[in-house]
Amino acid sequence: MSSLSKPNRQFLSPTTNNQDTGREQTIACARDMVVLYNECLKNHAVSLGGHALDGCGEFTPKSTTILTDPPSLRCDACGCHRNFHRRSPSDGFSQHRSPPSPLQLQPLAPVPNLLLSLSSGFFGPSDQEVKNKFTVERDVRKTAMIKKHKRTKFTAEQKVKMRGFAERAGWKINGWDEKWVREFCSEVGIERKVLKVWIHNNKYFNNGRSRDTTSSMSLNLKL
């Protein structure tokens, strides 16, 4: 009678347990690495009422970064805090997702834009450069608005003389003796282009008025 063979029992060795523990830790680390911090969204021109970014394409932690120390979480490229960088995915990591596969645990490819920035040593304009740019643009806009809204104020006597001159000249100065026109401008104290603009702006308005009012005024023109 043949003897019964004993069942081949297999016990998990400590090495197997360590491998399982390491795999769980790897999956846990991968779950933490799902959240990425991409381009910097800090507005460097907010104090000037504008919008300007520094061009940083991805958050790069410094060598002195400590995860438990929030103030140290600054980008080595642009110097801004990690919270200014766009978080991806924005809705955070879903707890209902299955653990990442081994293919997902591979390191992510670097962002080309960031590599170009690092190789060239340029990380976008500095705060001072952005401030200077917006200051110049603001001054240019302000100067343009002043020139646009600036109106020449005339005295009552100047208006009377210009109205009389315009009526004599047929509400136009082109075609008349240039010397006569300039002598009148010198007498009234205005420039020729100012007189031309005034005649153009008041031509149709004054043609609709009663000429009795104009004729009753003393023109005192030395023509």
Swiss-Prot record:
List the keywords (alphabetical).
DNA-binding, Homeobox, Metal-binding, Nucleus, Transcription, Transcription regulation, Zinc, Zinc-finger
Q: Which residues bind DNA?
A: 147-204
Q: Which PROSITE patterns match?
A: ZF_HD_DIMER (PS51523)
Q: What is its main location?
A: nucleus
The feature of type site (Required for DNA-binding) is located at I199
From which residue to which do the ZF-HD dimerization-type zinc fingers run? 37-88
Where is this protein found? Nucleus
The entry's function note states: Putative transcription factor.
Cite the PANTHER family for this sequence. Answer: ZINC-FINGER HOMEODOMAIN PROTEIN 12, ZINC-FINGER HOMEODOMAIN PROTEIN 2
Q: How does it assemble?
A: Homo- and heterodimer with other ZFHD proteins. Interacts with ZHD11.
The record's section on NCBIfam families has: homeo_ZF_HD (TIGR01565), ZF_HD_prot_N (TIGR01566)
Name of protein: Zinc-finger homeodomain protein 12
Q: Which organism is it from?
A: Arabidopsis thaliana
